[in-house]
Amino acid sequence: MEVVGTKFLYGIKVHLSGDTFDLCPADICKTTGGQELQRSACPVDAPKSGLKVEGYTPPDEIIHAIERIMQEAGIEVGGVEYIIDDRDGRLYYYDINALSNFVADGPKVIGFNPFTRLVDFLEKEAA
């Protein structure tokens, strides 16, 4: 889940298969429909994982928790990753970043370019 101005901007859901785990879901190579993503911000030789990603809006209570985490940490732009344990349904926030790693090819995955929103925020802050 990514935030700008401590407010929820967008989320992505990574569809894992088996026992795989990916610490950088922004670099996933395909949408859930199988469409290849433009990955200009990723290393040229990055291996393709075969994992699939889609835009996702979590439940309101998770959005509020993520916004609260970022506000309490004093992080205006960044990301929070979480996972729900299939064994017991518990929610775990496992990665809080003060630097956002926006999803590759935002328009295809989430329907807009998150960098545009980031630039708008930074211009407003600089004014």
For every predicted segment, state its role:
Residues 80-82:
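Hydrophobic residue at the +6 position relative to the catalytic HRD Asp in the kinase catalytic loop
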Residues 6, 17, 52, 78, ...:
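A general marker of short, structured functional hotspots
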Residues 56-57, 71-75, 84-127:
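C-terminal active-site "lid" helix and adjoining low-complexity regulatory extension at the edge
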Residues 1-73:
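Phosphate-binding site of ATP-dependent enzymes
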